[in-house]
């Protein structure tokens, strides 16, 4: 009878109050723009600035091998992802990059995982028709965990990850007329908030403006062109702080020496 209380006591004792410490991180950045704004090109230039080695860069390409159009930049790797664009297939591609020693992975585009052939929207429609009597709301109970696994794979990867997301014009009805109110990512609502930085690219000028920036590198900055230097600045920010893997290795070494 005391077991539940003992377990609760132990779980409370395991919680520790400690000072916040800045740790080294891997980049999670999104480029959002309509087609033709230069998402892939910008992502490749930034990626090279981060890792400085084309052999350590890969593009998961859902855009009919469009990444190969930029092969003149350097000898980066590609994974050609074709339908179905299910979360599981994206996860498989990300894991292949990790196992291949890639340090910066570009997902171009993440939009297909949500709204492409075999993506989450289509998966949910099929589930609704076949298992939930056309009730799409109930079907999301099964579809959402699939999408969440994709998001968690991105967030937990040991690689730097840059995602490219298509955007479209968002409109509202006002006074009987259609009014443009901005651009909307073709991904699940709140996608950009999962990431460290989200940059919007202008279709005509190809200049970037931040919609979210945890780094503080772009705060108050005028629209700017993405170059390798941008990647170098981001790399410096990512590497500021404690290297957790090195700290763990050092602790294990010290522990071994005590024996």
Region locations from a protein language model:
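Short, small-residue-biased leader/transition segments that mark boundaries at the very start
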Residues: 1-8
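Interfaces that engage single-stranded nucleic acids at replication/repair/recombination sites
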Residues: 9-33, 37-39, 43, 48, ...
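Residue-level preference for the first positions of well-ordered beta-strands
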Residues: 28-30, 56, 104-106, 160-162
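Phosphate-binding/switch region of NTP-binding enzymes
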Residues: 34, 144-231
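Short beta-strand-centered segment that lines the nucleotide-binding/catalytic pocket of NTP-utilizing
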Residues: 55-65
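A short beta-strand-to-loop transition that corresponds to the Sensor-1 phosphate-sensing loop
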Residues: 61-63, 108-110, 163-168
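Switch/connector loops and helix/strand junctions flanking conserved nucleotide-binding motifs
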Residues: 67-70, 113-121, 170-175, 206-210
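Conserved P-loop NTPase nucleotide-binding/switch module
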Residues: 107-142
């Amino acid at each position: 009878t005391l077991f539940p209380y003992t377990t609760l006591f132990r779980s409370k004792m395991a919680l520790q109050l400690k000072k916040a410490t800045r740790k080294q991180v891997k980049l999670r950045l999104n480029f959002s723009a309509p087609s033709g704004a230069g998402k892939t090109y910008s992502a490749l230039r930034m990626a090279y600035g981060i890792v400085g080695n084309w052999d350590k860069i890969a593009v998961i390409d859902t855009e009919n091998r469009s990444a190969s159009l930029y092969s003149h930049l350097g000898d980066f790797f590609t994974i050609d992802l074709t339908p179905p664009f299910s979360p599981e297939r994206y996860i498989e591609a990300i894991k292949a990059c990790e196992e291949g020693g890639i340090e910066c992975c570009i997902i171009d585009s993440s939009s297909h995982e949500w709204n492409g052939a075999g993506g989450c929207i289509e998966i949910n429609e099929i589930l609704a028709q076949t298992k939930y009597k056309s009730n799409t709301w109930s079907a999301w109970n099964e579809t959402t965990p699939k999408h969440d696994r994709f998001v968690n794979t991105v967030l937990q990867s040991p690689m730097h990850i840059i995602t490219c997301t298509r955007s479209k014009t968002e409109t509202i009805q006002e006074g009987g007329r259609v009014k443009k109110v901005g651009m909307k990512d073709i991904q699940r609502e709140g996608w950009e908030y999962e990431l460290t930085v989200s940059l919007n690219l202008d279709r005509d000028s190809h200049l970037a403006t931040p919609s979210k920036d945890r780094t503080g590198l772009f705060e108050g900055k005028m629209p700017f062109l993405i170059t390798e230097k941008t990647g170098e600045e981001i790399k410096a920010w990512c590497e500021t702080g404690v290297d957790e893997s090195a700290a763990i290795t050092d602790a294990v070494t010290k522990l071994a020496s005590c024996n």
